[in-house]
Each structure stands twice: as C-alpha cells, then as structure tokens.
Amino acid sequence: MDIKQYYDNKLARIGVQTARLKHRNRWFLTGEIGFFAALIGFLILYTLVPGGAWCLVCAAACFAIYGCIRLFDAKNSRRIEALGKLETVCRAERLAQDGDFSAFGDGAHHLHPQHSFALDLDLFGSQSLFQRLNRTVTTAGSNRLAHYLTTLPAQDARDDAWIEEQREAIDELSAKETWRSAFCALGNGSASPISSQQVSEALSAMEQISFPVIIRHRLLPIIAYASIGVFFILTACCLFTPLTATFPITWALLQFGFSFFLAVKTLRTTGQTIGHVLRETTVYVQLIRHITAATFVSPRTQQIQALLHDAPIAFKELESMLNAIDRRGNVLGMFFSNALFMSDLFLVCRVRSWLQRHRGRAIAWIEAVAEIEALVSMGAFRYQHPEARAAVVTSADSVCYQARGFYHPFLSPLKAVKNDFTIADGHFYVITGANMAGKSTFLRALGINYILAMNGLCVFADQLSVSVFSLFSSMRTGDDLTKGISYFNAELLRLRQLLSEAAKNRHTLIILDEILRGTNSLDKLNGSLLFLEEVARMPITGVIATHDIELSKLETTRPDRFHNYCFEIELGASDVYPYKITRGVAHNQNATFLLRRMLKESH
C-alpha cells in the first residue's frame, strides 16, 4: 500500500469512529436531560406525596445515574476531540504527499540572510526544506530542528558516529507512524506552537521565589495536621457533648488566618510567575507521557527517554499545583478549604518541595522533548520519501563528495533528471551553461543533499558518499537600501565573509553561482579570476556556476586543480533542456536567441 492510500484509509477510519462517537454523544445528552428531569420530578413529588421517602431514594438514584452519564459523556467528548486532532494531522500528511505543506510552519523567522548557506539552499520560508520536515509542536522543537539544519557537524564537533546514531533514531521513528501521528496530535490544539521560552522563563523565575522561614521548618506539616485533628475533635465534641459551636468555629477561623496569611504572598507570586503557562504545561505533560510510554530501541531515543523518566510525575504535579492555585479564585471554596484543611499552607509546602526535588531539571526536560520533536520531524520526512536512500558518511579528513544518480529533493522522482558528480578535496569545478539549463538547481541539490546526509536523513540519490566538512554558498546576494548597501557591495561583503569563515575551518566546500555579477563583463572576469586564484591557496574546495566561458580557461592553466563541466542545451524550433551535467564547456547560449524569438512573436 502506498502512502497516499494509507492516509486515505486512515482518514476514512477516523471519520467512521468520529461519527459513531458523535451518535453516542446524542444518546448521552438525551439520558442527561431525561434523568435530570426525573430527579426534579421526584423531588417535587416528595413535597406533594405523604410518606414519600421512596421519592428521595429514586431522586438519589437519578442523580447517581445522571452523574455517571456526565462522566461517560465527558470521556466521549475528549475522544472526539482527540480524533479531531488526529484527523488534522493525518490530513496534513496526506496533503504533503501532493506537495501541499501549508499546514506546517515554514520557519521563516529562523532565516538569517548572513548565514553560510540557509538563504541560498531554501532552508526556510514557503515550500522550504524546513517546512517539508517540520512536525514540531513547541517553539523549542522548532528551534532544535532549525539548529540541526543550519549547524553542520563540522561546526560543533559532531562526527560520523553521531550521524549514524541520528540515522538509527530517525529510521526507528519513521517506522512508528501511529506513534508519531499521536504525538503531533497532542500538540495540535492551538493555532500556534507551544511557547517553550515562556515555560522555561516561568520555571526559572519560579526557582527564585523566596519562602517564609516558618514554611521551611520541618515540623510545620506535623503541627498543621495536629491542628486539623484538633478542629475535627472539637467538631465531634460539639455534636456529641454540651460543647458549644463557638470553639470549632473559632479554631477554624484561626486556621484560616494562619494558613491564608502565611501562604498568600508566596502563592500569589507563584501564580503570577507560572500560572499563565498552565495550558503549555498541560501539553508538556501529555507529550512527556507519550514519550516515556513508548518502546524505543535506538541508543539516541533510549537516552532521551531515560532523561525524561521522572518528568511525567514532576510535570503532572506541577500541573496539579497550578490548577490548585487557579482554583483559589473561588473565594468561598478558598475560605472553607483553608478553614477546614489549611490548604494554602500545604500548597506552599508542595511548591517548595517540588522546587527542591526538581530545581534545574525542568529546563533539561524541555530540551529533551525538543530533541524528540526534531527526530519526529525527520522521521516523518523519512516516511514520506521511501524512494530516498541512506548516505554513506566517511571519516576522511578531507572534502569527499561522491554522488551517483542524485537530484534536488524538491523535485518529483518521476520527473527529476539524475546526475553523477564527484568532488575531490582542494579541487574546483567550473560549471558553464545557458540560462534555465539547470546550473542553480544542480548547485542547490549538492548543498541540500549534503545537509540531509549530515543530519542522518535520507538523501535523494542512488548513492551518496560524503565526509564531514564545512559548507558556504553565495547564490542569492541582494542589495539593502535601508543600510545603503548596493548589490555589488553586498557581493563583496559576502565574499569577505566566505574568506573569513573558510579560514576558521579545516575543510570547506564553497558553492558559488555567478559571482561579481554586479559589475561589467571584463571587470567581473578579472575579479573572478583573482578571487579563485586566492581561494585556491586556502583549504577550500569549490563548485562555481558561471556564464563566463573565459573562466573555463583555468583548466588549461591549472589542470591539477580546475575542471570544466557544463549543462548544454539544444536550440531550435523546439528548445531541448537535457539537465544533464557533462565534462567540458557549454557552447550554446540562449539569451539572445530567446529574446530574438520573443521580439519576432510580438510583431
């Protein structure tokens, strides 16, 4: 069964289940109305019929049945809501199979134009690689996924062993489609991702809360329990002895005053600090429970699961405390709970105990969930593309890039033209070709497949073997009038950045598309030659696309370092664009030819 058919069938099953539950809801509603009406009827009948004790029994039975139906109705409604979220997730996955990724965040806010390659390789924005991958439900998860796409292993000491572990985790989660869909559905209840930063900041601020000295005394809970015991003893004495009600009432008021005024400041501060993230905390409870309940086998996922071992109980306790603080808004309930049970006092003790046991750990748990989100996103991408293959990542201390039958990931495998290409360390490959011949798409295919490989993801090639190195591209330089930067000046700044970053790394692959296009042809040629001669002295390997045929002469003067490749086209009554890269220099250019045809057609 193909993926489209799988999701079509799954959506159909969800629709049937939802319809059945909604039908059940109508019966529950009818039952609630019926038994509530019967309850009122029996109570009225009790006041009208002599010796109507049996009416009270029937009323009590109706009330009990009504309560049970309400519970079943609430549970049924939660199941309908959960199925609705799951349907949204599955529908988004089904649309993704047709090339519609609008349901997923595009990560445009992660894009920094000065990044080494993010802008040129379409990592962020509409129809970007990030949007095709993104299944995150929190902002921390989105940040982690963006970090992996923009930070290559060569930049933060990750090696080929780390990449292999990453691949194992991705493959494992790719096979868990049901688990992944349920995970995404848990965070699908709001229009925007859960704000991890708000939760982290609230938890950090919560750790700074100060508690009264008496709250920290270890005998306080014992004294509180003893006081509550005295109150109930006084109440019993009031009922069964001549003792007046003044004593238990006075004691209750004293308990209220002691509990309320001792805890009110701390609870108010706690509520103001973290109460506004109750919804986010509830979602984290559900996500962490889902993670810890799973059965994982890969080392990476098992490590994350072990880190979250205590988190479900801790977050559930935090959620319970926040709900208790929120319920204090009911003044009458707050008064009686403090007067009878000193609830505020025990709530403050719970907050303090929670902080003592989990101080500093909650932030690590949030990061662990973010890691799972990034892996879930990559696993979903792997599942959506069964045609892709695993790359071979070598430990070679040099630039190694050997691709056979590779193509751009955004293209349909049925329509994409596959190419073979090998990049050797320290060599430069000058690619010439006409407009629309496929040079830029080829360069982006090189870069994006490398990023996928460095993250343990499947690549779009029959075979791809790469080493770990740094990457820098210059393909989409633009002017910035707000800063007074012209197009040509922006190009110079980009090339300066290239030299600076390449000098910091052991091995760098540069991908350039038509450098120095902001000046005239002769100046552009001389400048390009000067620049390439300079970078040839550095630990740099390069692929350069250009329209300047003169640059191909570098192969003649430096055959040991420079190599010519081209995308040739066939011009005629029907233009042919093979999109195949071959050795040599392009001979056909199409700008003048196409312009002449356009002018001829306009007459």
PLM-predicted stretches and their roles:
Residues 1-434, 442-471, 493:
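Alpha-helical coupling/stalk and coiled-coil linker elements that connect catalytic or binding modules
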Residues 378, 385-603:
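ATPase nucleotide-binding head domains, primarily ABC-like/P-loop NTPase cores
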